[in-house]
Design a protein with these regions (language model features):
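Internal, conserved structured core segments that host functional sites
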Residues: 114-117
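Heme-based O2/NO sensor domains and their adjacent alpha-helical segments
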Residues: 2-5, 18-99, 105, 112, ...
């Protein structure tokens, strides 16, 4: 019988998602539009939340839901102005992070497709 492996396992598990999130937040830390959206001075708590969410989404441990409940992504982002500029900046930093992983083409495409759809879904205003 063949063991079915999750996307999380296929791309390398926790180390892959740690690297993705670390690379992403390196960009966010210097971004004048995105950085103010994070309430903590240190981006560490936000990075951990994103890492746990992505790990769970892709078939890894369920720690995110155990600690925070249902993801409710749109609701959690509602207090912030997520306009097309913020979305595009988020995607630019995430593109750099995804590229740093050097995943096989199908895995890269699968991950990137999800991230793009998620970013577009978070837009909650077209105002500045």
């Amino acid at each position: 019988m063949t063991e079915i492996r999750s996307f999380y396992d296929e791309v390398g598990g926790r180390p892959t998602f740690e690297k993705l999130v670390a690379e992403f937040y390196r960009g966010v830390a210097g971004d004048p539009v995105l950085k103010p959206m994070y309430p903590e001075e240190d981006l560490g708590p936000a990075a951990l939340r994103l890492q746990l969410f992505l790990e769970q989404y892709w078939g890894g441990p369920g720690t995110y839901s155990e600690e925070r409940g249902h993801p409710r992504l749109r609701l959690r982002h509602q207090p912030f102005t997520v306009n097309p500029d913020a979305r595009d900046r988020w995607l630019a930093h995430m593109r750099t992070a995804v590229d740093s992983l050097e995943l096989p083409p199908l895995a890269e495409e699968t991950l990137w497709d999800y991230l793009q759809r998620a970013a577009f879904a978070m837009v909650n205003t077209f105002d500045d």
